[in-house]
Each structure stands twice: as C-alpha cells, then as structure tokens.
Amino acid sequence: RGTPGRMMLVKNPAGCNQTMRYLAGLNEDATFVVCLNDRDADGTDISWIWDADFERLAAMGEHLRHVYVSGVRADDMRLRLKYAGVDEVRIEVFYDYDPLIDAMCASEYPVFIMPTYTAMLDLRGRLQKQLGGKEFWE
C-alpha cells in the first residue's frame, strides 16, 4: 500500500546479529517487526534470542520509531527487547497477523521485518492474501 518494506529471516544469534548490524547502519527512521515462533521447523528452543544483540536495535535511539512483535512467542520477544533497552512505549504486541499488517501498512517509515522461518511463511502468506501479488515461488 505504498509503505516500503523488507523481510530478513532470523533464526539464530549469528544471523540475527548480522541483520542488526545492517539495520543499525541504515541510520534512518524505521519501523521494526520481530516475529518469533518456536515450531519444529524453527527449532523449539528460543533461548538464542538472549544471545542475539538486540541491544544494537535499542541503541538506534530516535531512529527506532516502532517495534512490533508477533508470533507464537511474541511475549518472550517483547521481554527480550525490554531487557535490551528498547523503550517500552515503542513496543507493541500483535497476536494476529492481520492487525500487524494493517499497522505495517499505516507506518510512515520503512518497515523491516525479522521473522523466524515459520513466521516468515505465515506472514508472507497473509501479506500476499491482503495485499495481492504472486506467491514467492511463482
């Protein structure tokens, strides 16, 4: 709907840290989305989020306009971001992807989505359904 967005898969501390380095280097206002699932295909142990450098996200300061969290383990992700130092007024939890997509589309800032594997599949399917477009593999 006109809001630029980019989706970057995160599934372990190393990959997540690379994504954080990239995002911190953008030096621009943005909305960030973290979707955390713990299904078999993701790996059921999400303790890796405590090893990932989400403090780098918090250090973005005023450029960090909003952080939306979603997925099966959204509450765990919210807690991790709180301990990383992200201002809690910037964190919003979405337990369903449809209102999350509405919020992303309403963002006046570029949206950077960081999902785990099954969250990526779920969210991509919902985005395609709501916004149109072909499936990724078509």
PLM segments and residue spans:
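ATP-dependent carboxylate-amine ligase
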Residues: 1-138
